[in-house]
């Protein structure tokens, strides 16, 4: 007798459930997507104990006909496709016919559904076995309840996380579905407490405000572009609003939320040098394309996709974001934090756009620290970053009481999705309608971010603090400038241009610089000699495991030539495959940092003025190459509010 046997349907469904139904969030995703495919405009999601005890989905969709109810719970039974050609024209969220039988095989499931043209159907299934089927009175739509999930697979139940974690996974899925389908009204309840309600009016920004808060919605930049193959729309936050994780970026392809690393990477590249390392924007990007260009049949969970014109899509995303940011003045508002009776007022103040009445600009008097003679020094040579001005011996020192620890700048925002579960009072329809109307009004009142160019306005210096920060003003208010970050941006653009072409002029070294490497490092560098020439580094083999450098480009920072060479070599050794674009970028960033003014370095009037004027000529005068802000703005209105001149 043969050893190979065909598995029965119940066992097959249990095996399939291992891929399709990983946790309660998977059940919610599959059932809500089915409701959307059924043309629902309103969907309610009711949970008990994060879905482990009970999940109930109620929609007003097309419903299921009586003769289809049993078939719907058979493996690979679907109304979405008929033949193999339909696989390449998929517009629906579901199509595999695996979700319902998989869910039913590991739970106690109850279904009440009606198409509206005939009596409804009531179906009860336990562990894949049909317990009850009868006709019933029902409105049009579907009401499906899943209880005691994984009751017959204790091993799977054992690996469920805490209720808080599982609920967080569900809210994350529901949030992304709400973003991808703003035309559908979604209500999410946990233990009879409302967590989310979207109006279903089609306004994505209102959905984003419901999820992330109205303060974040005020900082959203609209994104829109079109090519022959792709149409992209969405919103991304200004660089000042960031999070510590990529989870706040949502990518939607033909109405389907997908997890795609290269799409997220393209969004990050669109913020090139605008974000600090380890910080990520909040973003929502909807991509429409011919279904022939995307394969959604990669994994049963349908979260992974593959594109046939991936590079063209990535380029379109990067260029669209970069073009949008070039139209905006990216100066973060410092904001005013004062205690308010309303709990959200203080947070709102930090994000609020303030519009002070413009006044006639005037050139202020320059106030400099004692002991500095501006006539003795030449203006700072920012175009040739080599010789930096040194403060005189009798330099001004701030009082010790004013010295404070350096802190890296972070936007003053409360993380929204890091604590996604907002327990509220028991649901009340009147309160809920009022909240939605109030939110809708607030979203409508949001003023669009001005996209009239990103030129830095003229700034008139006032003075310097701690030899680190420059104070300047104009008719819009007060500006605080980080002098190191400012010159770092200037130097970066200078070096980025230089390192992008082979040096015509080189400086011969009096004594050739020798670089000793391990055998593995030597072989790796040897493979990249031609690539290194493209960034101005010419190496000659010297002995068994060594190279020598006889010259370097004249634009290498003076006194730091060998250090620059060592760090460039380290980059080559560290990378398995040298990306010349990345190598140039890293080299330019490294040299710009080393050649820039440091903290506690006092400048003359002419040097400050030259630095600010040079900053205005850069393509991005708002962040240093590492993504840190160069300047922060206090509007005149905010200052008047601080001093209670306005209430």
UniProtKB/Swiss-Prot annotation:
One of its GO terms (cellular component) is mismatch repair complex. Keywords: DNA damage, DNA repair. The keyword DNA repair applies. GO terms for molecular function: ATP binding; ATP hydrolysis activity; ATP-dependent DNA damage sensor activity; mismatched DNA binding. SMART domains: DNA_mis_repair, MutL_C. One of its GO terms (biological process) is mismatch repair. It holds the Pfam family MutL_C. InterPro entries: DNA_mismatch_repair_CS, DNA_mismatch_repair_MutL, DNA_mismatch_S5_2-like, HATPase_C_sf, MutL/Mlh/PMS, MutL/Mlh/Pms-like, MutL_C, MutL_C_dimsub. Signal peptide: none annotated. Belongs to the DNA mismatch repair MutL/HexB family. This protein is involved in the repair of mismatches in DNA. It is required for dam-dependent methyl-directed DNA mismatch repair. May act as a 'molecular matchmaker', a protein that promotes the formation of a stable complex between two or more DNA-binding proteins in an ATP-dependent manner without itself being part of a final effector complex. PANTHER family: DNA MISMATCH REPAIR PROTEIN MLH, PMS, MUTL, DNA MISMATCH REPAIR PROTEIN MLH1. This is DNA mismatch repair protein MutL. It comes from Bacillus cereus (strain ZK / E33L).
